[in-house]
Amino acid sequence: MAFPLKDDLGRAKDCWGCSSDTPALSTCSNADIFRRINAMLDNSLDFTGVCTTPNTKGKCEHLQDYPDTEGAAASRMLFSTSHEPLPRGLPDTNDLCLGLQSLSLTGWDRPWSTQDSEAGGQSSTPTAAQSVFSMLNSPMGKPSPLGFLPLDPIGSDLVEKYPTHLLRSSRFDSRSILDSRSSSPSDSDTSGFSSGSDHLSDLISSLRISPPLPFLPLGSGISRDPLRLGVGSRLDQDHAALAAATASPLGITKRWPGTSVWPSWDLLDSADDPFSIEREARLHRQAAAVNEATCTWSGQLPPRNYKNPVYSCKVFLGGVPWDITETGLINTFRVFGALSVEWPGKDGKHPRCPPKGNMPKGYVYLVFESEKSVRALLQACTQDLLSQDGLSEHYFKMSSRRMRCKEVQVIPWVLADSNFVRSPSQRLDPSKTVFVGALHGMLNAEALASIMNDLFGGVVYAGIDTDKHKYPIGSGRVTFNNQRSYLKAVSAAFVEIKTAKFTKKVQIDPYLEDSVCQVCNAQPGPFFCRDQVCFKYFCRSCWHWQHSMEILRHHRPLMRNQKSRDSS
């Protein structure tokens, strides 16, 4: 059954109110597509009032019957970014939306209209032919005739109208709306047209329509005009509805737009090496060896005046003969008391056997059972007093099978050198504490505090990390009384210390504590990013998520040294 367009006098009318003698709507570029659509609908459409051949001789002058109101002008500017009124007259078919968006989304021709209450009591669905005719018989800017079924506004019941996989997009794209299928029941009047076959969808997608509705960035400082304000506010509500209706946040993030600066959770699922963070953290501990110092301290270390010092039971033995054995060491030093030997190993560990076929690295550690044994050993050593610094070096002569009377250096540790407090009443704040690594063995807590105070100021405490025998392990902590000094020290990162006896480059990092992840606040946060852009604790997943961004990939993680935690 055909549905001709007739006026009150029985004459065929086009959609602009013109007689059939002068076709008002030139659809020549889409004529073939309209004919094929009509054929698929069993010729239920009548295009009597629609031009199918080019016509440039005349234009409809009956537009003056409908005065240009502000709403009418705005309706013609639906996709225009300019505020200037369009010239009066018939627009080109490429500029007209032709209502084709209504095939996939109701209310496209009136997106800014508030029709919620208007359409609340009506539930009937227009037929396929009526949908096409409404697009031709209701010009934009012309009031709808009485009895016209109000269309739903954009965004109403989106969750019900569109499949879930289309809604899981972080950006409300008009292209996805046009490409989506209707959710009308299969037995409804519009099911065959709206859902249709793939061939029909291809025909509709071939039609030339105007550009999609431009979206204003949310949260931007650009003010919206009254026309766009309605659209934007409705879209803002739709964004909130979509976020609430989406079952899994993971589905949203996996479909994040490619232009977003935020990373995708897909990177978490495809981590090549789950222990890459630990490896980078271990490498960072030796960063002082490959990085240049940002500042240098040179001077004289504070003098040491000990009264009845107490020593660690562990001593360092440097310059030992290369062919020395553990048996030879025990036989040489057991005259001072019972002892054991710790050989240097990888990662600062000290196994109880010589490495690689009894070949030592030139130094070992002796661990006596009593502190009195250390005192006896030092009394048997020769001392070289170091002028000005008040330091003294201890040397002991020993022999091996191939070396006779070899002098080895004995370096003890005074327990009082492990901590230095400048202000006993000052509360120590871990958030203003730095970790100092790669310390020289001659640096005690007082010397470390003096150097850091000269460089950054505000030092209230310095401590040297020790093992279970209370012997230093080459790292320390410094606490400041203000945030500025703390940040200056962290920013310095690498400091070179020059004295008359040694030159050493130390490494400064934030002091780490046991903390929860400061991103998700759910998992433990063993990884810390020292870059000022982040400067927080992360769990493994949150670290990969944040640092998968290209601008943050160069950040290196920090981890607490398990050995220092157990020993100090």
UniProtKB/Swiss-Prot annotation:
Predominant place of localization: cytoplasm
Gene Ontology molecular function terms on file: metal ion binding; mRNA 3'-UTR AU-rich region binding; mRNA 3'-UTR binding; mRNA regulatory element binding translation repressor activity; ribosome binding; translation factor activity, RNA binding
InterPro entries: CEBP1_N (IPR032292), CEBP_ZZ (IPR032296), CEBP_ZZ_sf (IPR038446), CPEB (IPR034819), CPEB1_RRM1 (IPR034977), Nucleotide-bd_a/b_plait_sf (IPR012677), RBD_domain_sf (IPR035979), RRM_dom (IPR000504)
Annotated residues for binding of Zn(2+) 1: C517, C520, C539, C542
Alphabetic keyword roster: Activator, Cytoplasm, Cytoskeleton, Membrane, Metal-binding, mRNA processing, Phosphoprotein, Repeat, Repressor, Ribonucleoprotein, RNA-binding, Translation regulation, Ubl conjugation, Zinc
CDD domains reported in the protein's UniProt record: Bbox1, RRM1_CPEB1, RRM2_CPEB1
A Pfam family reported for this protein in Swiss-Prot or TrEMBL: CEBP1_N
Region (Necessary for interaction with microtubules and localization at the mitotic apparatus): 172-175, 182-191
Domains: entry comment: The 2 RRM domains and the C-terminal region mediate interaction with CPE-containing RNA.
Role noted for this protein: Sequence-specific RNA-binding protein that regulates mRNA cytoplasmic polyadenylation and translation initiation during oocyte maturation and early development. Binds to the cytoplasmic polyadenylation element (CPE), an uridine-rich sequence element (consensus sequence 5'-UUUUUAU-3') within the mRNA 3'-UTR. In the absence of phosphorylation and in association with tacc3/maskin, also acts as a repressor of translation of CPE-containing mRNA; a repression that is relieved by phosphorylation or degradation. Requires zinc for RNA binding.
Subunit structure: Found in a complex with cpeb1, tacc3/maskin and eif4e; dissolution of this complex results in the binding of eif4e to eif4g and the translational activation of CPE-containing mRNAs. Found in a complex with cpeb1, cpsf1, the cytoplasmic poly(A) polymerase papd4/gld2 and sympk. Found in a mRNP complex with cpeb1, a guanine exchange factor xgef and mos mRNA. Interacts with cpsf1, papd4/gld2, tacc3/maskin, microtubules, sympk and xgef. Component of a ribonucleoprotein (RNP) complex, at least composed of cpeb1, lsm14b/rap55b, ddx6/Xp54, ybx2/frgy2, pat1/P100, eif4enif1/4E-T and eif4e1b.
Family: Belongs to the RRM CPEB family.
The name this protein goes by in its record: Cytoplasmic polyadenylation element-binding protein 1-B
Gene assigned in the entry: cpeb1-b
